[in-house]
């Protein structure tokens, strides 16, 4: 019974870490990545569609993203959507292809990004601790209902804390890896 609570808690914490990784993918580093454009929606004949559903995205060079719309008439709406996304990118088109050149990040901007990364990591840690609290509450409820003994509760609480510590350490690893990536010139 305690194993169910702990495994449910662990999978919930794993989802929190996955969510953090997805959030980090959206953060601009010094390198071009199509994931920078994941959140951009384009007006495609009256319907808001993700950018990757109206154009082919590619990264031909470390600081360049190219977009090749499937329909040449889509170039102006795609450029407008990119400008409205406030990513600090200026689209340039040659009639068939849109190029996005990523300017190099300044030292000051890199430090701002690292601050943002640390905030995301702290939010993830808070979420993990909240999941821990819910799991401990569930275990105490089981003990109150006499479904587990007090000794089982103490053992399970220790296991919950161990799982929590390992997930917090994984969050720190993810942060450290992304921080290195951002600070790399």
Swiss-Prot record:
Alphabetical keyword list: Cytoplasm, Protein biosynthesis
Highest taxon listed in the record's lineage: Bacteria
Subcellular location: Cytoplasm
Cellular component annotations (GO), alphabetically ordered: cytosol
Gene3D superfamilies linked to this entry: 3.30.1360.40, Ribosome-recycling factor
Pfam short name (any one): RRF
GO biological process, one term: cytoplasmic translational termination
GO molecular-function terms, A-Z: ribosomal large subunit binding
Role this protein plays: Responsible for the release of ribosomes from messenger RNA at the termination of protein biosynthesis. May increase the efficiency of translation by recycling ribosomes from one round of translation to another.
Similarity section: Belongs to the RRF family.
NCBIfam families tied to this protein: frr
Record protein name field: Ribosome-recycling factor
Source taxonomy: Bacteria, Pseudomonadati, Thermodesulfobacteriota, Desulfuromonadia, Geobacterales
Gene: frr
């Amino acid at each position: 019974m305690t194993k169910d609570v702990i495994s449910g808690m662990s999978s919930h914490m794993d989802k929190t870490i996955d969510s953090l990784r997805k959030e980090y993918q959206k953060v601009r580093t010094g390198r071009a990545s199509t994931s920078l454009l994941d959140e951009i929606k384009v007006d495609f004949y009256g319907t808001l569609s993700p950018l990757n559903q109206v154009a082919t995205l590619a990264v031909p060079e470390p600081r360049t993203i190219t977009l090749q719309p499937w329909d040449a008439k889509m170039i102006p709406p795609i450029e407008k959507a990119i400008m409205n996304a406030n990513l600090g990118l200026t689209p340039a088109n040659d009639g068939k292809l849109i190029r996005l050149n990523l300017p190099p990040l300044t030292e000051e901007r890199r430090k701002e990004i690292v601050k943002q990364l640390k905030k995301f990591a702290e939010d993830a840690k808070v979420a993990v601790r909240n999941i821990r609290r819910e799991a401990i509450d569930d275990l105490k409820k089981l003990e109150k209902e006499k479904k587990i003994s007090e000794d089982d509760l103490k053992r399970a609480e220790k296991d919950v804390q161990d799982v929590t510590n390992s997930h917090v350490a994984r969050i720190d690893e993810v942060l450290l890896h992304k921080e290195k990536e951002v600070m790399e010139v």
